[in-house]
Amino acid sequence: FISVSLPREIVNIKKMLQSTIHSKGAEIKWVRDGNMHLSLKFIGHTPETSVDDLNETLKSVTEEFSTISLSIVGSGCFPRRERARTLWVGISGEIDKLDDFVDAINGRLEPLGFPIQERKFIPHVTLARIKYPQKHTPDVTQFLGTTFAELPMKISRINLMSSQLFSKGAVYTILGTHFLVSKA
């Protein structure tokens, strides 16, 4: 997958929001602190032979964009409050520029065999996942109603990541880092 690293302070936001969920036996899997990120594109299983082409392509895209200013703001869930499966924090700021950047990544990777995602890109940071069926549905009302000071961040680089799933969770490895051109 292609992602953006987050400011360290995201951990404080996650901990504060964790305290708002009264799970009463519900199973909620919180993303480990070091694994939180902003996903730009999921590319799925990729042969090692494609990594160089991916990195070369991502480098060419990042060279066409300057730093993107964003903020982490607000909380939400997918698909709906009554049966939330994903708990997240949102992104605001230069969203049009971010959308253009993601579109450019998609457009350049499609000829390499990585299809454009059909779902509209909704920038967010996943904090937790809830699997069903389970005996207790967590009440996410307070999570969704909690406000916090927005956390500014800049996208100045992106990472091509690999993800390996283990019983204790995913382990991410950086396969390439690509820098956006700095603002003068």
Which stretches of residues belong to each language-model region?
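Histidine-dependent nucleotide/RNA phosphoesterase domain, centered on the 2H-phosphoesterase fold
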Residues: F1-A184
